[in-house]
């Protein structure tokens, strides 16, 4: 069982926000891409996105295009989007369905969906050429609770070891079985770290999110993960209908076999470095973050529901989606304003309050990951 402490107990006095360079420097951004995004396990979506053999998505990670595809054998694999002949990019559409092969549009080198080279015109005329020597370059891939993760590192930390702190933690929410009801994409003119720091505290909620603050008091927060790459805990839902929706009522059946206390809580966790996970009694929301520059972040947000909810009378996914779309946009707006202010020569790191202890803990995890001392 997890042990929760009040959010203020996770606070370490004296810590300040990060210096300006961490939000505006292209050099720091480059370090982040190489030391963090090219070395860590990153969420790239849901297994259900790749429902049939040949289904694929492209993801750009640390400047690299990666194909994530379901093979004819049903297994999901990831490969660099690079032909082994002369380096041509193989796929350009962000998602789609391939036939039984991937063919390079330049000289027609052809690969099976497991990356094996099976066609290379005229290469039989090259002495010693062996197609077995030229498979697509693989990218490490792992599945967890219905989510897919990739890692560009040559020798990545084993996924089970990296995610050990989360093993079984969310099993009661039946994450692997949940079904997507909506996905929304956002382009935010702010540094990716501001998004994480904002997610990690609700001190701003009464001012920025009056609708949210009416349904869950910002002082109700307790945390069970408050140091390291995974951080978070819960807040109490006080809405009479027991849900964070526009109506305040549940928009569908419970996502799992939840204890009584879970039916009145929303759990918020950040999974370093690119995932935010929000677990409600009647739905689960997750964000993935994709930094594009020191001041630009692409964010996807997806809402998951119990599979039996679809088609049921009274199922109202838009009640949740609209609530959080409004809340998301409030967050993105204030993060963009923070980005503008931090870019000023007048900016100096300010002190964190006891209500921002998880944001400060996230900063510590970030500094460790990039190899900088705090």
Language-model features: locations:
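General detector of N-terminal leader/presequence modules that precede the first folded domain
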Residues: 1-8, 322
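Non-catalytic, topology-defining segments of multipass membrane proteins
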Residues: 1-4, 15-16, 179, 372-373
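Short, contiguous pre-domain boundary segments
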Residues: 6-20, 176
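Short Pro/Gly-enriched beta-strand edge/turn motifs at strand-loop
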Residues: 39-51, 120-124, 269-273
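Soluble FAD-dependent oxygen oxidases
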Residues: 32, 64-66, 373
